[in-house]
Design a protein with these regions (language model features):
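Single conserved hydrophobic/aromatic residue that forms the stacking wall/gate
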Residues: 1-20
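Nucleotide phosphate-binding site architecture
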Residues: 2, 121, 127, 137
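Active-site donor-binding loop signature of nucleotide-sugar glycosyltransferases
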Residues: 11, 118, 122, 141
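Soluble or luminal CAZymes and related metallo-dependent hydrolases
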Residues: 17, 99, 144-148
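Conserved catalytic-core segment of NTP-binding enzymes
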Residues: 23-124
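C-terminal boundary of histidine-terminating zinc-finger modules
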Residues: 130-147
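Short, amphipathic alpha-helical "lid/cap" segments that border enzyme active or binding sites
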Residues: 146-157
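Generic C-terminal helix-cap and adjacent flexible tail
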Residues: 158-163
């Protein structure tokens, strides 16, 4: 699979090399990949130094996580040796749901420190923001969801600095 895909993963990887070697002064470049393990996602993994996995605490997401982790390991071994998992971010979380609490506990037990402390709650204001053409953190800065994303941003930066 990976040997036949090697030539298809060069475009974004070449772009990221150009960005890093240019005079542009970026602290971070975020590549938002689709949730499916497609060629687009593979390109993103080849161009990235690290992966943040947003994950709903639900049964099927937990099953898909093992496939994603295996893919990340394969990309690391065959295409991009600098790729690492920065962490897992629990999103759309509803603490009233027993299953979500159980899946969250399983994530913590299996991945430990790789799981970010910040949890992004299920939040109506975040869900409404795209229909107004705005990012959730700008749409309603006082919402629980926006506050959680701001907290996550600070936690992410701190984690990357200590890697």
């Amino acid at each position: 699979f990976f040997s036949s895909r090697r030539r298809h993963t060069r475009c974004l990887s070449d772009w990221s090399s150009d960005v890093c070697s240019s005079d542009l002064d970026y602290d971070f470049v975020l590549i938002d990949c689709p949730p499916a393990l497609s060629l687009l996602t593979l390109n993103g993994l080849c161009a990235a130094n690290g992966v943040i996995v947003p994950m709903q605490c639900e049964y099927f997401a937990l099953e898909g996580l093992s496939d994603l982790v295996n893919t990340i390991k394969q990309v690391h071994a065959n295409l991009n040796p600098s790729l690492t998992i920065i962490g897992l971010l629990r999103v759309m979380f509803d603490p009233r749901t027993t299953l979500q609490q159980q899946v969250s506990e399983q994530l913590m037990a299996h991945f430990g420190d790789k799981v970010f402390n910040t949890i992004i709650p299920r939040n109506v204001r975040l869900a409404e923001a795209p229909s107004y053409g705005m990012p959730g953190v700008n749409f309603d800065k006082s919402s629980r969801g926006a506050q959680a994303y701001m907290q996550f941003g600070a936690e992410m930066i701190q984690r990357i600095k200590t890697m």
